[in-house]
Every structure is written in C-alpha cells, then in structure tokens.
Amino acid sequence: MGLTQILQNSQITLPNPHLNSLSKITTTNKKIDSNSLPTMSEVMEASKAQKIHLQLQTLGPFFRIAAKSLETQNELGRAEGLIRVWFGGRVLHLDSIRLRRETLGMERSIFGIGLFIGAVAIRYGYERGCGSAELLAINDSELYHSKLVRFYKRIGFKVVHEVTGSSIGDLAHMLVWGGIGTRMDANITELLLKWCTRFKSPN
C-alpha cells in the first residue's frame, strides 16, 4: 500500500499480518465497561513519561503511528496498518512495526517502544469498533522470528496458524506477504485489559 515506507538502512521490521483471515474472536467491546480500559490520552501520557512522543495519522481505513524520542527528536519506530471490514465485523490489521536498529540496545526497545506503538494501534482499533487484531510474524530469521513470537505472545496474541509454505493453503499467505511466518490473533478488549495497569491512570 502507499503508506508503506522504509525508515532508513538501520531499521528492523517486526510483523506483517495476513489480510484474508476471518476473526474467530467472539468477545465484543460493549460487554466491558469502557472506563476500565486505558484511553488514548492515557497511553500517550504514559509514553511521554518514558520520553517517547507518539503520533497517530489516519487516511481512510489506513493508519500510521510514529514514535519519536523527546530527548533527541529522532524517530525510534513506526507502525502501519488498516481497519478492515470482514464477515465477523471490523478487524485491526497490523501491516508492520519497525524499530530503529539502535533502539534494540535500549532496555525499553521491543517491550517498551514496541509496546507503546502497539498500544496506540490497539486503542485506535477499539475506538473504530474492531473486535480483534491480526498479524503475521515473518520468519526470515529463526532467532529473530522466535523473538517476535515471544513478544506477541507476551502482549496477548495467540498463534492460529504456521505458514510454512508446505501446503496449498499457505500459497495465498506467501503471495500476499512474500514469506513464511506465524499467524497470530488477539481480542482487542482483552489486550487493553491486559495492559491496563501499564497505561491506566491510578485515579
């Protein structure tokens, strides 16, 4: 899509999602008291406390989230995706999350910067009425792929399919994304509840 851009040579890419899968998540946002969930402003304020500025831009169904250091003004990472209407309702598709390679040496890198970027995306999906989120953790390196899968499991995603290229059913995945990996889904409301203590204001 037109929104996809490469940061610079010193970057690392986290996920790519599969756009053609049907959400199997049944929990709906309206069953949860919205006051118990972290708001977008609370996520933004929590990021500022870590010296990170997050910016959300939207264009039709597409969105882009950029993370910038408040200390250096350098871009630390970026996420892109879209809101898609599917048979089961609206679904949040995370096209990619990219982090600068230099951030990997920071304690707050994947489980910090990546988590903040992901939280903005998930909250945005919730506000747009999405019930679930989908992605594909690309397997272009066994070591890095295992880190990706652990990261997504830690924040609340579940494995639904391994795209290995060994079956005809994997062909569509590989044609769209150009590689193999692990398909993962998550319930958006459950993600926000899981992250509640990290982002929700005490009062």
Question: Where does each model-flagged region fall?
Answer:
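Non-catalytic substrate-recognition and accessory regions of acyl/acetyltransferase enzymes
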Residues: 2-112, 116-138, 145-165, 169-203
